[in-house]
Regions:
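Active-site loop immediately N-terminal to the catalytic Tyr-X3-Lys motif
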Residues: 21-24, 71-77, 99-100, 135, ...
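Substrate-binding pocket helix/loop in short-chain dehydrogenase/reductase
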Residues: 22-23, 30-35, 117, 128
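A conserved structural motif in NAD(P)-dependent oxidoreductases
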Residues: 132-143, 154
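Alpha-helical segment proximal to the catalytic Tyr-Lys
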Residues: 51, 95-99, 156
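Short, small/polar-rich loop/turn modules that mediate ligand/substrate recognition or access, typified
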Residues: 98, 103, 158-160, 166
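Active-site helix of classical SDR
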Residues: 46, 82, 90
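Residue(s) in the substrate-gating loop at a strand-loop-helix junction
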Residues: 66
Length: 172
């Protein structure tokens, strides 16, 4: 956008990988890979976009976290730490930039029908769905619609928040 002459006004941090393993078996590379992609890259991209947003006195920064960043999940200490870190990062950043017309929010999806969940066997899917009061996986379009809302003018008074889109998992 900036190369085309328009400043960046909306940033969605949605990169995310997993390298699941029990902590006692987790390799340093598995930890580092997940933190580098899920947290450090988001920080670097956010920092690169902030100057233009500050100058324009407007911006929307939306980070995609996960229910796992709030609840934890066995075998995903690295992923949970990275997604919880995104929530803390976003709250701190929201406090820094709110007076400049920039909102910073987080979406914490539950289990969404994606290639990551497609690899689960029927037993694993059944176990997941048992933790979702709505009894189904979410759809990518539901996360996209939430992102569009947080980027909109109508969400201009929402900052520092985490919006849970998880079929009710956060209430359990």
């Amino acid at each position: 956008a900036e190369a085309a002459g328009a400043p960046i006004s909306i940033l969605v941090n949605n990169a995310g990988i997993t390298r699941d393993n029990l902590m006692m078996r987790m390799k340093d590379e598995e930890w580092d890979d997940v933190l580098d992609v899920n947290m450090t890259a988001s920080m670097m991209i956010t920092r690169a976009c902030l100057r233009a947003m500050m100058k324009a006195r407007f911006g929307r920064i939306i980070s995609i976290s996960s229910i796992v960043g709030v609840t934890g999940n066995p075998g995903q200490a690295n992923y949970a730490a990275s997604k919880a870190g995104m929530i803390g990062f976003s709250k701190a950043l929201a406090a820094e930039v709110a007076s400049r017309g920039i909102t910073v929010n987080v979406i914490a999806p539950g289990f969404i029908a994606t290639p990551m969940t497609d690899v689960l066997d029927d037993g694993q899917k059944e176990g997941l769905l048992g933790r979702v009061p709505m009894g189904r996986l979410g759809e990518a379009d539901e996360i996209a619609a939430t992102t569009v809302f947080l980027a909109s003018k109508e969400a201009g008074y929402i900052t520092g928040g985490t919006l849970h889109v998880n079929g009710g998992m956060a209430m359990l």
